[in-house]
Amino acid sequence: MSDNYKPRSLIEIVNDVLSTVRDYYDSEYVYYIEKEQDDIETIYEWCAENVPWQRDRLKMLPSENQPKWMKQEITDTTSDSYSVFQQLDEDTTAVLAAVGVHRGGCEIALMRAVLPYIPQAIALQKMQKQQEYLSYHDDLTGLLNRNSFVDYLDHVKEKELKSLGALSIDINGLKN
């Protein structure tokens, strides 16, 4: 990898994917939603210019008021909304939806092709954050560990310190 390469955040990646889907279908909105039964756990939204965000409103809707595209797949390309589903686990379903489509007759193959990668990116980011957390915290207690202390010492300005202390406790067999 070059020195100029900087990994992009999950938000940037998902926004790029949703923006591409929105442009392809010329829709007002594109959503990626993870729902457990009828409760929305995760929601990402991308909308056309000068179109108000609806993410928070959608998240608060009771299940009986949720739009049709959120409850069932809509693959009829003459409809004004398309949605595809993917079962992530026993209770969780991923939904990718283009809402307010202006260019009808498009194949939904793009949505079917893209959908599996979004939850994968989300899962990878969660695992990365967990690894980062565990590199500076004890897994059993959640307390800061030696790596955290060493990192702190690398970044602290000695001239600004008035005092510094560290407590280290090693109890044999605690983790066994």
Could you tell me what each predicted segment is?
Residues D3-C47:
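Helix-loop-beta substructure at the N-terminus of cytosolic sensory domains
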Residues S135, D154-G165, I169:
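Nucleotide second-messenger and two-component phosphorelay signaling modules
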